């Protein structure tokens, strides 16, 4: 049985929507541990309860987690560290979760910086975007680590031979700044069978690459832009259907199944959360504005990650890369 701990106090809509998401998820092969204050846990029946006296607000400084050791986020990470649970989820402050995960769990041997990995919708199912916001700036060797972790994650998700692309302002080798050009050469050296070269922003959702590597600043901007575009498309469709005449509404009704599939593909809530990869434990960062549906999906992401042993897979992939080429 997979044991999942969730921070009941993290997120803009905590604790109410977090609790409702946990109720929606409910699976026989998973045991849920809710980490929260006495008040938040009062109506949480049918779950394992972990009572805490403190929680971190969304605008907290990232390093505060290291001082507030009775907070829900800190305690959840400690449960993971001690082996009491298999995976921890929080919709709380990203910086605090990253700092806490790195400090409490430690990094996987060979990884200098953890990264956020998000499977974004694409024409071939998904594209793993890494880093989606953990590191604003990164060195070329860090981006190679991200490629290793993204490759491993894509394999876990079912890609037998995932292709890797480097996010850039053009496809030519000479494009981009010094960091990007150096990263290009390293990826070509370490991943000759996987690296397909530079990809651009418009390639993220086309399936051109199964893994897209970038530093956290541009990765986060890309992810948020996709979320905004998806919202605009869905809201526009909804608005136009409401304004349409009788015949058009009949047509829309006949296409209800198509619209439902489109909504599912574009809705950011459908991918639930991002893994913080590179730490010695499985941690899922849910969106700060997560509602119950997003939390339900984040729990499913966590379950699959634990079942597929992502951390162990990354450890093996890093060893393979280290053994296959020149010193880093």
UniProtKB/Swiss-Prot annotation:
Pathway: Lipid metabolism; phospholipid metabolism
Entry EC number(s): 2.3.1.274
Any one GO cellular component localisation term in the record: cytoplasm
MF-aspect GO terms: phosphate:acyl-[acyl carrier protein] acyltransferase activity
Catalytic reactions of this protein: a fatty acyl-[ACP] + phosphate = an acyl phosphate + holo-[ACP]
Keyword Transferase: yes
Pfam families the UniProt entry points to: FA_synthesis
Keywords: Cytoplasm, Lipid biosynthesis, Lipid metabolism, Phospholipid biosynthesis, Phospholipid metabolism, Transferase
Keyword Lipid metabolism: yes
Family to which this protein belongs: Belongs to the PlsX family.
Role played: Catalyzes the reversible formation of acyl-phosphate (acyl-PO(4)) from acyl-[acyl-carrier-protein] (acyl-ACP). This enzyme utilizes acyl-ACP as fatty acyl donor, but not acyl-CoA.
Protein name: Phosphate acyltransferase
Species whose genome carries this gene: Pseudothermotoga lettingae (strain ATCC BAA-301 / DSM 14385 / NBRC 107922 / TMO) (Thermotoga lettingae)
